[in-house]
């Protein structure tokens, strides 16, 4: 169970069912496994997904959405794990269920970031149990390379502190018993495929992940159609303030102390 002080700082909406809301995912396993948990706990269905190229929807009439593993700009609801502040005084999305947003982690104090998956944060927030097997726990740590911080002497203390705050001390024991090479061997290609309006995950990789995680991975039913085209690119910290004020900004993430990955609306249908 998540540390009470940290839990109380998460937005209230993220702990309860939000009637009439649907999910927006991305094209990777961290997002889809997180959506699977939210579907199991709250019954949410996925209506949209976003890539760096565009935004796709099944039902265009649905207006209320929650991003999953998406660092949405403004005040839009999202579960996320990215650093989204370029400077210590940058605006932050108050509706982001994200440790890094809650603790005001920016590029100014980037080495203090929580470098875990969105999935781990959601599991802790909603008190979802860890996989039953050692192999399942190891695989969980490979998602979004959540294990990596432990193997840096510089980040290890921070990594361990965050794991304790999430209430997953058992995972600290797991990394102590596992080499970095072991994790690399367990890790799979986490990319999903979008083809002919459907979001899919390679059958063998899907079954492998499901067997280790202990639950079925949710995949949305229905035909996705392009709703918007994006312009995605990278820039540096010096342009962070200007970028955060851009009215066309869809999402962004600080990928290092100086680099920013961002996505802007280009064309909306």
Report the location of each language-model feature.
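Active-site cofactor/cluster-binding pocket
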Residues: 53-107
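C-terminal accessory domains and tails appended to enzymatic cores
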Residues: 6-10, 129-269
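Short alpha-helices
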Residues: 83, 88-158
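Long, contiguous hydrophobic alpha-helical segments, chiefly transmembrane helices and signal peptides
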Residues: 25, 32-33, 37, 67, ...
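N-terminal ordered "arm"
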Residues: 7-60
């Amino acid at each position: 169970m998540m540390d009470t002080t940290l839990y109380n700082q998460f937005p209230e909406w993220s702990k309860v069912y939000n009637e009439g809301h649907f999910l927006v995912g991305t094209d990777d396993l961290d997002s889809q496994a997180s959506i699977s948990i939210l579907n199991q706990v709250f019954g949410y269905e996925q209506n949209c997904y976003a890539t760096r190229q565009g935004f796709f929807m099944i039902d265009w009439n649905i207006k209320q959405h929650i991003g999953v593993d998406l660092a949405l700009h403004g005040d839009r609801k999202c579960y996320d794990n990215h650093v989204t502040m370029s400077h210590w005084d940058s605006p932050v999305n108050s509706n982001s269920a994200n440790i890094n947003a809650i603790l005001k982690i920016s590029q100014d104090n980037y080495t203090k970031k929580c470098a875990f998956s969105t999935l781990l944060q959601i599991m802790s927030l909603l008190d979802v149990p860890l996989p039953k097997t050692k192999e399942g726990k190891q695989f969980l740590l490979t998602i979004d390379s959540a294990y990596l911080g432990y193997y840096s002497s510089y980040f290890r203390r921070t990594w361990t502190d965050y794991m304790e705050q999430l209430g997953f001390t058992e995972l600290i024991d797991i990394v102590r018993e596992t080499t970095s090479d072991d994790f690399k061997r367990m890790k799979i290609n986490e990319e999903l495929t979008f083809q002919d309006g459907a979001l899919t995950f390679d059958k063998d990789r899907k079954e492998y992940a499901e067997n280790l995680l202990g639950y079925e991975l949710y995949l949305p039913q229905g035909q996705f159609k392009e709703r918007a085209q994006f312009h995605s690119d990278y820039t540096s910290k010096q342009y962070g303030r200007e970028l955060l004020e851009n009215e066309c900004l869809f999402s962004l993430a600080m990928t290092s102390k100086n680099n920013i990955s961002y996505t802007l609306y280009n064309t909306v249908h």
